[in-house]
Amino acid sequence: MDRSAEFGRWKAQSLSKADLSRKGSVDEDAVEVVELLNSREEFFTTSSCAGRILLLDGSTEGSGVQKQHCCWLLVTHKPCARDDVMAALKGATSEAVLKFEPFILHVQCRTLQDAQTLHSVAIDSGFRNSGITVGKRGKTMLAVRGTHGLEVPLTHKGKLMVTEEYIEFLLTIANQKMEENKRRIGRFYNYLQHALKRETISNSHSKIKERNNPLCTHKNRRSQGKAQGPSTTEDNGRELEDGDGLEISAALFLGDD
């Protein structure tokens, strides 16, 4: 199957699936970014979180939304107050941890070059832990990740180990990180718009130049004829694509689909 057609099939399948996240919808601060990417032929998003402050308990007992071996006592995508945390801590029976998790976004890209464009946008926006993964089946994934997280234990065996004053101090830091996270998402959206506009203009100019230059058109046709010969396979194309990525992007990983 043609690579572009296969990517289109993957995209249609992914976007038709129900949202299985706890919230069941895209976070408000990430909506514009997600909609912009999904409106383009070369991208689609597979998961996202705009950033959140949460309080997790290491026990699966008590109230809250349970996930794996911990209990979610509190989760918010907005700035958090001390009273909210203190009330939630009453449900802690084990090792309660206060966390801030920054924006994360997973995007499947049509080509490695598309992923590299998006990777540059992410790095320039402040998401320095972003990286590209190329799977064995040719799926190219870009993870947009930040490094400005926070994780602090508050209780041990259900007993509060810090003062309320310290919790208020931690929330001040977490809320500041939340605001900075929101600014970075805004930068990412703006930079992404400019990058996609440049790509569109560049592609348009290349097509016009090719149409107006008979010699260029003749050379391209000869190149295409060679590329379609029996010695060229899809696997060879992937190897060439992978090689380009290793030269250009340091954050490239090979893995399973």
UniProtKB/Swiss-Prot annotation:
It is an enzyme of class 2 (transferase). Its EC number is 2.1.1.282. Keywords: Methyltransferase, Phosphoprotein, S-adenosyl-L-methionine, Transferase, tRNA processing. Pathway: tRNA modification; wybutosine-tRNA(Phe) biosynthesis. The modification Phosphoserine is found at S25. It comes from the Eukaryota. The keyword Methyltransferase applies. One of its GO terms (biological process) is tRNA processing. It catalyses: 4-demethyl-7-[(3S)-3-amino-3-carboxypropyl]wyosine(37) in tRNA(Phe) + S-adenosyl-L-methionine = 7-[(3S)-3-amino-3-carboxypropyl]wyosine(37) in tRNA(Phe) + S-adenosyl-L-homocysteine + H(+). Residues 225-234 have a biased composition (Polar residues). Belongs to the TYW3 family. Probable S-adenosyl-L-methionine-dependent methyltransferase that acts as a component of the wybutosine biosynthesis pathway. Wybutosine is a hyper modified guanosine with a tricyclic base found at the 3'-position adjacent to the anticodon of eukaryotic phenylalanine tRNA. This is tRNA wybutosine-synthesizing protein 3 homolog. It comes from Mus musculus (Mouse).
